[in-house]
């Protein structure tokens, strides 16, 4: 019978949909729960690609094995469907984003079924569904009520093409992460979320979770906690100039100060600066640059010296110049920095450009040529008055104590992390459920009025003034204040795409609840997510944002755990043939539909796991796909030769138990490629030995998570389904028995006077007399010893026997 993968895969996909063997049962106390999570996809028009298939298949394998091991498994799927690409498509093609989204979700769903994933299809969520975003809005209202959502006027990242504000995390090397267009700085009033209030906990609680180390490192670096000192300099006009430094030991080396172009002092000093026109021109130029461009270490240093105001050094009392320069960002620290050119290369470059003094305060380098930035803290202080002779490590606490006692400084913990720019001037996002009342200010909608629905608009075109398309909907915008009943206007900004993905894993636990985001019972039963796999590119975006929201929900008693995910792993990218990143422009994008049509879903799944180390990038090879198909053909053909016995073939028992251990361990450690290699080796050996149905029963269960369709079909054909009343995916996972990996018999070489005469099979660890008797029963040995006397027997246990003979 031919292996007809098309018919087989269709048959089992329909059967799984009908019989629902992958349904998760909330509250089942008879089984241990396991919650496996993948990052739900954005349903683009291009459909599912191999970049989705790799992590989805891996988690499907993990969850299928867990079910077979007796766990109550929650493995859900949904769609992160708000966002810019759909809105841009709608603008270009004059079609409502909701229609585009519905079509794309239907296509994705078809593809996910096609690949045989064991999702619980009764728990699908869609972030654009009002019954879902009702609770996204509810969470925002709780943040607002607790003072963690606030509006602030600030310089923001403005995409010149998307015409919307971007979070810092969405700007990559000075361009928009989404469209690649130039990002400039623009002053705008924005809704902000105070993620910085959770900065310490977001770092400290990483110690309590099982995340791969590179994820922890990236999050710690992004949050950027540093212990330092705030020091107060004074301007000659009396204003206080506070700086933050981690190296207060270098205070005697300060020869100038730099202020950010956005600092409010500059506008206040307008009439005191004799070169205001030059300062203002520089400020305007800086506003056109992104934070990335301004912060590049290698860029040429620019700036304007303030004429009319200087700074007074707090320790020496000397007057030092103040410059405005764009490398100082208002969003980090205080927006003012002290220049220590002797020991910071950027400061040295600046001082060199503007002819400023360079003072050595840590001995060891030649500061006339470049900064001496010692990497450790053993350098010796010089030119530093009462710090002279101390090491850097000794000098820091001495200076910190000195500035504190003199009332000009204080210890300070600082973070690189900025509050989250939350609002977007777009249409296709969750409406923000607030109104602005002249009398009451910003007022939240009553919770019984949620969801605030996204209204129909005539055009999704962006306004040139940077306002949302919703701002043109005057009938919708104008409303009444829920607090005083007076006239009010709705907020017309919408939430970013990240909003819906901050809590989707909670909704999976109870997706149809209209009274709460999820019931207390469901949250307590399923929390936390046991294993979350996702892309490294989301480490400082979605992963950080969702941890923040979850901690907030924990604080208000809405969820039972401090952390959302117990374990986080990541995967490498699939590259196109030749090792280049897949892209439409290169014409090297692999469509899973094509592979499935030609080779089958099981082959696709098997290959995408066999292609290389899961955590590393791997190069796609269509030729290599054929190898995975040949392996499945071998399994199919082997099953057709199986003897009608449920006993294991003695020659296969050890092979199978070694394979059970290898596959079980490798799935748990994401070594899917070596698990498959072990099964390939086992199939080759079993083909040589011959198999029984009993042998195949173990092999099919091990292979089922990887290739579920073919294994279900063979399980049924070999009568296991009829005998057990279970599909293969419901059968028990094979249990490893170490004693079975030790062979019961061994083949030993037979020598007569050192010359090879044949082999004999005996029980393992047989004694000399047993082996000798068995050897003498072999024809060639009998002929070689005929008429001879055995004078000595040499036995190498389990390997050989050598009979030393002489004529009688």
Residue spans for each PLM region:
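Residue patterns forming the tRNA-binding/recognition surfaces of aminoacyl-tRNA synthetases
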Residues: 2, 15-19, 92-249, 336-456, ...
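Glycine- and acidic
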Residues: 39-48, 120-125, 329-337, 381-385, ...
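Secondary-structure transition/capping motifs at alpha-helix termini
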Residues: 64-72, 92-98, 110, 114-118, ...
């Amino acid at each position: 019978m031919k292996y007809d993968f098309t018919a087989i895969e269709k048959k089992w996909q329909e059967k799984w949909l009908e019989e629902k063997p992958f349904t998760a049962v909330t509250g089942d106390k008879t089984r241990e729960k396991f919650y496996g999570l993948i990052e739900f996809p954005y349903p683009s028009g291009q459909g599912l690609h191999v970049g989705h298939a790799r992590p989805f298949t891996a988690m499907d394998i993990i969850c299928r094995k867990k079910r077979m091991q007796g766990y109550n498994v929650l493995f859900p799927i949904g769609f992160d469907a708000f966002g810019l690409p759909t809105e841009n498509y709608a603008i270009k093609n004059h079609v409502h984003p909701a229609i585009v989204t519905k079509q794309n979700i239907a296509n994705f769903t078809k593809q996910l079924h096609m690949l045989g994933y064991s999702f619980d299809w009764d728990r699908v969520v869609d972030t654009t569904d009002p019954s879902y975003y009702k609770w996204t809005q509810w969470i925002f209202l709780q943040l607002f009520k607790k003072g963690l959502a606030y509006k602030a006027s600030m310089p923001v990242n403005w995409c010149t093409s998307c015409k919307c504000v971007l979070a810092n995390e969405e700007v990559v090397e000075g361009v928009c992460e989404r469209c690649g267009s130039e990002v400039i700085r623009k002053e705008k009033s924005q809704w902000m979320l105070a993620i910085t209030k959770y900065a310490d906990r977001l770092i400290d609680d990483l110690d309590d979770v099982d995340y791969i180390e590179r994820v922890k490192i990236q999050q710690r670096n992004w949050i950027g906690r540093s212990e330092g000192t705030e020091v107060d300099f004074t301007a000659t006009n009396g204003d206080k100039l506070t700086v933050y430094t981690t190296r207060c030991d270098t205070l005697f080396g300060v020869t100038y100060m730099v202020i950010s172009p956005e600092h409010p002092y500059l506008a206040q000093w307008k009439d005191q600066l004799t070169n205001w026109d030059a300062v203002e021109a520089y400020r305007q130029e800086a506003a056109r640059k992104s934070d990335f461009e301004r912060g590049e270490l290698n860029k040429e240093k620019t700036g304007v010296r303030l004429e009319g105001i200087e700074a007074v050094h707090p320790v020496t009392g000397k007057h030092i110049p103040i410059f405005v320069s764009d490398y100082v960002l208002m969003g980090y620290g205080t927006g003012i920095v002290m220049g220590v050119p002797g020991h910071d290369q950027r400061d040295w470059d600046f001082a060199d450009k503007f002819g400023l003094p360079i003072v050595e305060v840590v001995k060891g380098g030649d500061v006339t040529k470049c900064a001496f930035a010692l990497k450790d803290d053993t350098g010796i202080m010089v030119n530093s008055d009462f710090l002279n002779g101390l090491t850097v490590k000794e000098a820091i606490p001495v200076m910190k104590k000195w500035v504190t006692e003199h009332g000009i400084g204080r210890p300070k913990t600082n973070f690189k992390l900025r509050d989250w720019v939350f609002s977007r001037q777009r249409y296709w996002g969750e409406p923000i459920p607030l109104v602005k009342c002249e009398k009451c200010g910003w007022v939240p909608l009553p919770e019984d009025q949620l969801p605030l629905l996204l209204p129909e608009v005539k055009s999704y075109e962006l306004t040139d003034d940077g306002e949302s398309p919703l701002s043109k909907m005057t009938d919708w915008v104008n409303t009444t204040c829920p607090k005083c009943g007076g006239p009010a206007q709705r907020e017309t900004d919408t939430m970013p795409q990240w909003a819906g993905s901050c809590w989707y894993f909670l909704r999976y636990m109870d997706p149809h609840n209209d009274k709460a985001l999820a019931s207390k019972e469901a949250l307590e039963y399923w929390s936390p997510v046991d294993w979350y796999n996702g892309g490294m590119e989301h480490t400082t975006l979605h992963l950080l944002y969702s941890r923040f929201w979850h901690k907030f929900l924990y604080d208000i008693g809405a969820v039972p755990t401090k952390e959302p995910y117990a374990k986080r792993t990541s995967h490498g990218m699939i590259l196109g043939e030749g090792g280049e990143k897949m892209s439409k422009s290169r014409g090297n994008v692999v469509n899973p539909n094509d592979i499935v049509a030609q080779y089958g879903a099981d082959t696709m799944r098997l290959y995408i796991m066999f292609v290389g180390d899961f955590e590393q990038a791997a190069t796609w090879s269509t030729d290599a796909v054929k190898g995975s198909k040949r392996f499945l053909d071998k399994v199919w053909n082997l099953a057709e030769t199986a003897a009608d016995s449920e006993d294991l073939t003695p020659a296969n028992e050890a092979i199978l138990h070694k394979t059970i251990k290898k596959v079980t361990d490798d799935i748990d450690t994401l070594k899917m490629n070596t698990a498959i290699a072990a099964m390939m080796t086992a199939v080759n050996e079993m083909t040589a030995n011959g198999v029984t149905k009993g042998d195949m029963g173990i092999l099919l269960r091990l292979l089922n998570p990887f290739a579920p369709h073919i294994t279900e079909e063979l399980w049924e054909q070999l009568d296991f389904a009829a005998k057990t009343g279970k599909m293969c995916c419901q059968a028990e996972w094979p249990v490893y028995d170490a004693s079975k990996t030790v062979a019961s018999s061994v083949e030993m070489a037979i020598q007569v006077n050192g010359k090879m005469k044949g082999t004999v099979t005996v029980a393992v660890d047989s004694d000399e007399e047993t082996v000798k008797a068995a050897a003498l029963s072999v024809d060639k040995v009998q002929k070689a010893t005929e008429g001879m006397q055995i004078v000595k027997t040499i036995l190498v246990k389990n390997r050989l026997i050598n009979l030393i003979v002489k004529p009688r």
